[in-house]
Amino acid sequence: MTISDKIRIYELSRDLNLENKDILDAAQKLSISVKSHSSSISAEEAKKIKNLINKKNSDKKILSINKPSIKKDNFKQNKSPSISSKKETPLKDNSNKKPLLIKPLNKPESVKIISNQLQNSNKPNIVNTSQSRANLTNTNINSKTSQNLNQDKKTFENNITPPIKSPAKPPIQLIAKPKNINNNVKSNESSQNISSAGDNRRLSNKPDQNTNKPKTKNYDSKIKTPELVGAPIRREDPKINPNKQNNKQNIAFKQTGSNRIGSPNRPGMPNNRPGLRNKPSDQGRPGSFNRQGNPNRPGMPNNRPGLRNKPSDQGRHGSFNRQGNPNRPGMPNNRPGSKFNGQNSSGIRKPVSPNELLQLQKNNNSEKDNKDKNNNAKQNINGPNQKAKAPNMRPNATPSSKKPPHRAFSNSSKKPGKTDWDDSAKLEALRSKNPQKQRQKVHIIGENDDSLTSETSGYSGEKISILSASLARPKKEKSEETKSQKSIKQFKKKKKETTRQRQKRRAMELKAAKEAKQVRPEMIIVPEDNLTVQELADKLSLESSEIIKSLFFKGITATVTQSLDLATIETVAEEFGVPVLQDDIQEAAEKTVDMIESDDIDNLIRRPPVITVMGHVDHGKTSLLDSIRESRVASGEAGGITQHIGAYQVEFEHESQKKKLTFLDTPGHEAFTAMRARGTKVTDVAVLVVAADDGCRPQTLEAISHARAAKVPIVVAINKIDKEGASPDRVKQELSEKDLIAEDWGGDTVMVPVSAIKKQNIDKLLEMILLVSEVEDLQANPDRFAKGTVIEAHLDKAKGPVATLLVQNGTLKSGDVLAAGSVLGKIRAMVDEHGNRIKEAGPSFPVEALGFSEVPTAGDEFEVYPDEKAGRAIVGERATDARATKLAQQMASRRVSLSSLSTQANDGELKELNLILKADVQGSVEAILGSLEQLPKNEVQVRVLFSAPGEITETDIDLAAASGSVIIGFNTSLASGAKRAADANDVDIREYEVIYKLLEDIQLAMEGLLEPDLVEESLGQAEVRATFSVGKGAIAGCYIQTGKLQRNCSLRVIRSEKVIFEGNLDSLKRAKDDVKEVNTGFECGVGCDKFSSWIEGDVIEAFKFVTKKRTLSQ
């Protein structure tokens, strides 16, 4: 098909005079793929769309025929006869018919009125299409109606109850009671409406006899399935009583149950409207629609107590039941201009339609309820003196001047035939094709409708009691339903709140019980040096509110999701008694690389065990190792503490055989955590040294966690048993709380009490170490390239980069090319712990190696490669990763948070202390950097611009001079020319040998950058005992009670315990002489330039401001 055969959507909409969305909707229903109004479709598809739209237009034409046939012009014409009939009716007839108020059923005139009405109503004057449609059934219905009317007259006269037959003396008390009066008025109305109601019901139950239209069956089939619910209607039993007399008697009572008049017969409309109920134009045609809430079911009487049938809407041609205003059976449509209204006006003034009563019309179509209501109605028909129930009483209401268009019309100036009815009819017709369940609409009648006056109710000139609208509405049903709904809502709401509160209480109880049962963890691990408040609370088994409260008291405002740095985490954890371990340190303690490979299995031999000595500082680790080595290493260490990892190999004779043991001595100071972790990473057996007089300390617990992370056995050496106050059992008790139970207590942990100074039980300790190592079955393959770990590394000014290596597998030889991390090296020389040069080193042998291109990182694994090319390729990849990691660390260190920015904005520019750090070995650099991170940084920030192992060079001096930094040297020396360059550039160089002193000086330097605080210092107190006027001012004669007064000091005047003045003391005299100060017990004169209102009894407090040095803790 060519493009010329294509048609666009907007062209088709223009041809059909429709909107684009209508065409798109039609295309969607026909499953034609279109996207927008500019989409193209084929001519065949366009034809399908046109057919569908033409079909819809044909349905709309049917709806336009079914509109209300009475137009405004016709309505005006129909209105005049009712007015004329009203005027022509003589008022004197009311006096003759006044007894009808009490017993209207006994008067035959009521039947005559009905017959006259029916005769007069046989003069139709229907306009437009309603006439042609009414003629279809009028011929059949009129004959049937006349027969039924004659039968109704006879039946009505024969079935009048005897108590109603006394017309002479109407009881006066019934006039005063609104219920009986209304009941009588209803009975009078029933005499006028009985024939139309009865015939209407009978004809509606026999649609096939009255019309030959096949659409009536369609209506019956549609109505016989009452799926929908509607307004509460008091109906009779759905089975019509074959005894028509009793049936009519019931109908008469039900119609007299409220002050309603029958359906008005408008002039020009046929009176036999009951026959028009089954017309296909209204009930059977596709365009008609009965509201979902109230279907007219055949066989079900539409006469509820107190409500008349409404034949006007059922029989009117072209009428339809709008959803907002359904045709409810028994609801009259009192339209102005009705001929019947003219008849009624001759005897009784027309009461207003009960549609306007204030009530909620709700659904009640159960047959059981209808039977109960009908039985109540039959009991009420026994006589007019019997009281009727309140729900059946319908008072006359004043018609409101303005009513919603969906209500029934009363005798007011409101005209029917609103245009919005036509639109709703089209909507309902479309919905009737695809019926679906619709939400029931409840409409509330206007509040003005329940105002009752004597002008609209009862006989003319007669006083009548007014019934309140609250009594007229169906109390029982409405109140019970509303009350039940409210009670259910209240119950549900109360239940929901109670459940929430109960769940909250249970959760709190569970948490309290959990906290009571939980024990604080031995140690927490901090991943990546930060944790959120919630994560820290979970690790500490605490509520997050406890962490936030602890931080608040420290001056830190935090939320649950805020991240905390390592220093803050350690501070909070220490408050709750839990030590902190960094995650990278934990990972450093784990053995990540398996030194034994599958190719080594055939050549494995036993190797010496590697033993790491660990414990708290000053617990005697190095002294114990000295006793084993029979040397004096500890005495030669700075400050008497170990600040390096020492690697030693010892020969020990066991069972007539010489055994080699390799010992690693780790620092016990808290700053050397990373060193301890590296020690456990390469160890085979961990020796935990605990002082018998000190017990378990934080570093002891940390060492235990390292050993467990490395999954190595632990041998406990309880040292210093020779000291006073030593208690080995107390140490065992504390260790048992950490799941280290001694063998003599039934556990599996070897514990040996020793004395390093007196060398007690040293041999026993070595035997236990060998026994444990034999159980581990330690093996290695010496016939391969060496693999191992860098224990320590430093830069020697004479030798260059030097690394302490521990060979774990294979044999390391001079001249081997090795890669340690991202550093490539070729072994030039190897030295053992005694300083002797060796050619090769086997498994478990520690050596110092020279020949690296730069200082390797302590803790890295090294491996020997066959040639330099292979090693360089590996090093290049590792160097790239190392640079990325270093850059990420630098970016993290420069990270600025909003809190730090706000601090700088409030307190001015943040002060910084720039440092350049040089140390002897890499481990010392790590320890110092870790300690600096833990210093308070609220007001002073420490920035380490450069840190490396090695001596201080001129390059370091130049960098310090350019950045204003201080150079920190730790166990290192100055290169040649560095001292002269430092003096020339005025660079401060500080050298330290002990880490304690280094950290103290840095903290003092940070405090020196803080501005001092001004603190008030009290000088003395004096009392005013006399006042003297001098010129414009006044002098206070004072007596010094305590301290002294100084000239130009600050003072405050206190009167009646309130400060009334604060300023400077400008004049101080003793007798007539000016003095600088006056001490306690003397009198003096005090004068202030800005204060002269002295009164005897005033107290003068003298003080001055002094500066106080601030500390970082503040």
UniProtKB/Swiss-Prot annotation:
UniProt-annotated stretches for the region G4: 719-722
Keywords per UniProt: Cytoplasm, GTP-binding, Initiation factor, Nucleotide-binding, Protein biosynthesis
Domain of life: Bacteria
Similarity-based family: Belongs to the TRAFAC class translation factor GTPase superfamily. Classic translation factor GTPase family. IF-2 subfamily.
Region (Disordered): 69-102, 181-507
Annotated organism of origin: Prochlorococcus marinus (strain MIT 9301)
Region entry G1, spans: 615-622
Region (G3): 665-668
Pfam families, alphabetized: EF-G_D2, GTP_EFTU, IF-2, IF2_N
Keyword Nucleotide-binding: yes
Transcription among keywords: no
GO MF entries: GTP binding; GTPase activity; translation initiation factor activity
Name assigned to this protein: Translation initiation factor IF-2
Database matches in PANTHER family: TR-TYPE G DOMAIN-CONTAINING PROTEIN, TRANSLATION INITIATION FACTOR IF-2-RELATED
Gene: infB
Region (G5): 755-757
Sequence segments annotated as region (G2): 640-644
Compositional bias segments (type: Low complexity): 240-251, 262-278, 290-309, 321-337, 376-385
Comp. bias regions, Basic residues: 489-505
Domain named tr-type G: residues: 606-778
Gene3D superfamilies (UniProt xref): 1.10.10.2480, P-loop containing nucleotide triphosphate hydrolases, Translation factors, Translation initiation factor IF- 2, domain 3
Ranges of compositional bias, category Basic and acidic residues: 85-96, 365-375, 417-431
